[in-house]
Amino acid sequence: MAESAGKPQASKSKTEKAKVEKNRAEKTDTSRAASAKSGSSRENAGVKADDTVKANSGAKISAGAKAQTGAKANAAVRPEAVPVDFAADPTNYVNRELSWLEFNYRVLSESRDKSIPLFERLKFLSITASNLDEFYMVRVASLKDMVHAKYAKPDIAGLTPQEQLDRISERTHELVEMQYSTYNRSLVPTLRQNGLRMITEHEDMTEEEAAYTDEYFRKNVYPVLTPMAFDSSRPFPLIRNKTLNIAALLRKKSGEDEELEFAMVQVPSVISRIVELPREIDEDGKERRVVILLEEIIERNMPSLFLNYDIVASHPFRIMRNADLTIDEEEAVDLLEEIQKQLKKRQWGEAIRLEIEDNVDKRLLKIIRRELSINSQDIFEINGPLDLTFLMKMYGLEGFELFKAPRYVPQPVPALMNEDDIFTNIRKGDILLHHPYQSFDPVVNFVRSAARDQSVLAIKQTLYRVSGNSPIIAALAEAADNGKQVSVLVELKARFDEENNINWAKMLEKAGCHVIYGLVGLKTHSKITLVVRMEEDGIRRYVHLGTGNYNDSTAKLYTDCGILTCNPQIGEDATAVFNMLSGYSEPLAWNKLSVAPLWLRGRFLRMIRREAEHAREGRPAHIMAKMNSLCDKEIITALYEASCAGVKVEMIIRGICCLKAGVPGLSENISVRSIVGNFLEHSRIFYFFNDASPEVYMGSADWMPRNLDRRVEIMFPVEDEVLREKVIHILEVELEDNVKAHILQPDGSYEKEDKRGKVLVNSQEQFCREAILMAKESADQEDPARSRVFKPVMSSN
């Protein structure tokens, strides 16, 4: 939380921590000579000396950066390779894709939890559906591409691409079955009991409801529809990715021709899929709302689309297509133009998944399967409405606020409540931000204030994902209009945000900003803003560094951390980062920051191995790490070695985890938990005990090959003692969570912690309470009268 609130009670002194850690430390496997002391190795981070990464604007990063010592020890080096005994056995690792599916099961478990408000359960079920869509469009599509290319190299868990596809299909069919069991057997009946009837089949309508929907169809739907036939003169219709369609088998009413015809119609996305009917009175005399899905109305009225034909069978269906972009950046003359071309192809990629009703006419299914070239393992026969993402729209229905969690309002940051000038506040000391518990407004205000401050000379920022009506973009454009030097790296390759980012890039260029499209072969995923300001004592650099995107919308839903600072060394590093991104620059070393792809992997490995060395020497050793995903084999193997050396390793990993935890002789000192709650856990935090001199870092990178090797990422230290204790407090509270945490078991499954006899700890709710309390205390100190009119922060709106 913000630095003005003092140290949390949960934090322990260095002496107390040392005693606790010493009691847990074990000296094992002392013969592992390959583990080196911190900083002892000087290899060059796994990149050949002549390798370079060229920027689209002409910048390049040289892998020949030389290691330096002293204050600049964090150079482009890599520790020696880890021993191969753990790495050689694929059974020591979990397949990435199967691990992701287990994460989606954890999200699904929230929709099955009856202690959660009903409409929140709808939301979680919708999220599992949208997650699965993206998983198929990207990950499954990539595996299919490998199979087509006859690529059969096993992954870290020893599975070939085809073996992965087979297991994914099996596990996904089980997941989908559980999704619809939850929907049909739990959610729909519970909705009905609480005043909302879902008409699941159009045959179930009353006469009045049928008449209403028929009139609705005639006035609002029929004019929009385009029925499409398939015969020798008309090819099979092109079906866009993720669209909902209704296929039909037809037989002509007149004549003796028994031949069946195939036709289809797309369910229009321009009309709301959820149609509300007149309210009804239930068995108890209470008013109840009634809704039906648009495809049910269309299916009921199919005869009006195919006059003089009998509808033999009709079934909704939906396909998923390969949406993974293939861009040859080296050959592209204009990266922006090339991405725009590829985006047009995304809607028409290879069909990789088919959803259709479970009672489908097999003759109709045969036609669809043949024309789309769909494998049997990629066909999902569904017992319920296709595409459960509509439940997110259901969540938005008004009148059901009692069945939703109270809306949390992000709190003001205490350190920024007493001064109007944000730069004055930052000069007083580094400021820690913890979103969404604390407001994202200070980040927006930082950029906006810089745009309007006459003393500001330049603003530089990286953008990966921003909101649809971004105040950050508006502030950058305003800054350029005010004559400031504005440089923005807009990452055009941010998946599924490519089109938005292209539009923002064009707008910023028109506003007079210098826009960089990213680096060839790399994604720029770092979150950094640099403001250069002329002050009485000369130039001062202000920096924001964060773990999450500059997106004011998702900042209300994702848990992230950030720091505002004017530390001169961080400012110098920030300048070097932007010089590296925008021009010809070859940083040899860094003062405070660690930057991927050349420097970050080696930094992490050295710190992990340092803890292992301390444990072997009989000293306390402890690692705490929080991230979205862990699937890097080299990092995992280093953690296994640390565990065997006696290092206690505690990790909070929301999503993918390819590490096996709690396995004797391998990882008995490693624990992993995944927190799934109202907010999406997104921050990356790393703690190393370091012989009772703890080091704490935050950053944009997960422990994944893509983050460490193929992206520009930044890790930054938290050096202020008070702020460091607060970040440690975040980790400690999440490690105590026994309400929303799922614990990884040695067999790879996840289980909720046994709460019997324990004080319940919901980390997200605790952070909400802490933020409310700190903001109130700060407001009361500023003006005691405000304590009587303090704004409530929990709202049902």
What are the residue ranges of the model-derived segments?
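Hydrophobic alpha/beta core scaffold segments
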Residues: K648-I652
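Cofactor-pocket helix-loop regions in the catalytic cores of large enzyme subunits
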Residues: N628
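N-terminal localization/anchoring segments of enzymes in phospholipid and broader phosphate metabolism
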Residues: A2-I623, E641, A645, C657-N797
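Glycine/threonine-rich ATP-lid/beta-loop region of ATP-binding domains
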Residues: K633-I636, Y640
